[in-house]
């Protein structure tokens, strides 16, 4: 990975349950450790983990050349509202922008919805008479006298941090910078954040929220970094402390202290970098990065060995994992979807008798019931303990001793009893005659509790599969032909099931999977993405203006990177574009070299091509807009050595087995157990099997096999299924996608998924689990329809207020499932309009691919400008 002359380096990832520490030795191999996260003082777990790993390796801290840190401190401060006392100064007339929000509602069916409160209360928001226009012109001169009055009130108000956000400052920052000058004259020690520096992008709601968030956490992060650096120096560290930012690059501690909002979502970024590295090593050009830890599961797409990036994301959601319920942050980030599906995610049965998993988590304290640290809630980890995937003898995380009894008690109380499961009616098939070879102190085969555990596992698997499908659609991608990289403590337990559900050929489980994000930190380049909104259209393109913006962004990004390294750098440029009238942009890469009139002309063609890739068709004759520009400068990373795929050999004979519930068989079966440390390149393990190591366990499902690759990565695929690219390895190791396309939404059927028919296994109550999974998948299908409509809409009410609905109906016109995104009022009109189509045309006359459309209010569309479209499938 690096020249062997380099010294050891350390990566530290603070998660919701565990703090992971990875040490890279000079030869490029890794040592690692997990310690429980200390939420009140996160540096305690960081320092304890570093001390433990260097002591075990016999390395003095002063020999370590880099310490790279990803922290949730900024995220937690925003969630828990425990940042600095902060004021917002904005343009007169725009005091309430962060409170009035947008028209979007994250829960359309909640009449008593409580919108997230603004980060800064109204009494702490001040205004200055001034106004910059959308093209940077001064519409109202900056009122110095009024500004000095605001400064005096800020000084007297006891604030420790100030956010400044004036209208259109991304085009002309003079007024914001002048206010900072006045404030520093009066209070030099007061922290100040300017929106023109933190997030120079259009859309004032998002920009103002971003600068408020930066100001709110700035004193906290600056203090934390000072304390951590001081303690590291006291321990003997002589190297710099570097931070990973949400865009997946490294930044100096000084830069992080100035722009701490860029640290939000820094941990998950490390995981995506880790997956991208594996893509290079194993010559896979398209990867699904699957990171499942103790609290959440994160899914990202890797293309051409690089993670996809976005310009905005949400944090501090009040309705966790519901889009629109949080605070928008407009800074570059690795694009991913995050759901409450971790090992510590809590399972329960709702009022409808359905198993729900997450988003609440048992966290590190008290943790899952099986940790025997006082937790009583049933979790995904407890389910894996009960069905035999996790075993006390091979669970080495942080020295925790698993209690199978506590896991069983929690599952029975939270899931089994509410569903009416009992040993007398359960039909899991405990296979009581099967014996283990050697002592087995795992969970006994209790059919009722097994049924509860299998139900929890099935639901969390389906939740993650639906999240992956949704993320792919939002990105305009089809997962056919992708591979998966699974890491995080819980991902290897669920990866086999996930690739089967998604129609993915294979999953790679790398060495160090349990601490993948921390290793990813050590693979990250110094990087910074500078962004700015600058409006240009295909009708009147300002080439010189764009050229100037790109030069300024390049200089800004290079300056930040040079704060941390003198290495050679690369530059990438991108613009967000749309059709005039739309409100959602797609990214278009810019060519290298000077931006001139020829490049401007080529930009239109590049946008049309990108739009067709996203949505299937372009729209002729419309004006195209370029709205936001970005330049990313990164240090050059060493190209890793690739490995050739290892062929499968004869499956190894198991040294030991234990009874583990097999979802395909619907019962417990003798399952081979292998210690990963004993496996060598070329070894083949046939499922059902478990491959154990200190920080995770890999499940090789029945009908699958794992082959150990040259770098000791496990490649798992269905038995006899070659990787799509192995038959034809094209030049440049681009994969040959020759296998048949699969439906991304194939539904469970009696012939296709016997495991889903039997996996709940116990009585009428547990037979509802596969029906619940099928319904969830239908919801995922129509949610994709709704999201695509929002993204392509020219109607403000559709894209901002969700003035739409999407659903699936049976032959008689009864709705089976509807999208979460949408307006309740359209549901009934949609059903009535469909009834009109059925009555007028007849179901037997309809054919797949037909399209029926009406805007007739008398056929229940509601208004002339409302349209109902139906397509038979």
Q: Which role does the model predict for each range below?
A:
Residues 185-208, 503-519:
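Conserved phosphate-binding/catalytic loops in two-lobed NTP-binding clefts
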Residues 24, 33-40, 87-93, 113-115, ...:
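Glycine-rich phosphate-binding loop of actin/hexokinase-like ATP-binding domains
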Residues 206-217, 261:
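Glycine-rich tight-turn/loop motif centered on a GG-T
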Residues 4-6, 14, 145-149, 153, ...:
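C-terminal, non-catalytic interaction/recognition modules in large multi-subunit enzymes and RNPs
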Residues 71, 165-167, 195-197, 246-247, ...:
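Glycine-rich beta-strand-to-loop/alpha-helix junction loops that act as flexible
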Residues 13, 87-92, 127-129, 165, ...:
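Short beta-strand segments
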Residues 1-87, 133, 140-162, 176-181, ...:
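N-terminal glycine/serine-rich phosphate-binding loop of ATP-dependent small-molecule kinases
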Residues 11-14, 18-22, 31-45, 49-51, ...:
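Conserved phosphate-binding loops in N-terminal lobes of ATP-dependent enzymes
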